């Protein structure tokens, strides 16, 4: 985990990561007690919906767009968890959100560029990114404590 670190939005260090600094949005969707994961291609690992910022988008708009584009999910509310600062392969900042969802798409609703959508009680294997578990643990901690 030397290449990535999570900073909670409740931490004073979070001020170092203003929204304009975020290049990626990562969303941890919960379907009840299960987490929703996607696999973009069959040979890659599982990941949370994640996308890069397009010209003119806010990071919140990126998160909403990616939820729809990768999982056909519309969330009524996105809660900001914090940021992940990654240094490998190049420095980047990701804003991490979580949300509650009421609907998970059927197989015929899955976007063409997504191989699978799954709901899990634990982290599935293989993971596309090692820091997915760090992000999941932060989201689970927020759900347990109720501190958002």
Where are these regions (language model features)?
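Acidic, metal-coordinating catalytic segment for phosphate/diphosphate chemistry
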Residues: 1-26
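Residues that flank catalytic or metal-binding motifs in active/ligand-binding sites
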Residues: 23, 93-95, 113
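Short glycine-rich loop/turn motifs
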Residues: 24-26, 35, 114
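Active-site beta-strand termini and strand-to-loop segments that position acidic
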Residues: 29-32, 99-101
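Conserved Nudix-box catalytic region and its N-terminal flanking loop in Nudix hydrolases
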Residues: 30-70
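A short coil-to-beta-strand element that immediately follows conserved catalytic motifs
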Residues: 73-83
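Active-site-adjacent beta-strand/loop module that shapes the phosphate/pyrophosphate-binding cleft
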Residues: 84-107, 118-120, 135-139
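Nudix hydrolase/Nudix homology domain
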Residues: 111-148
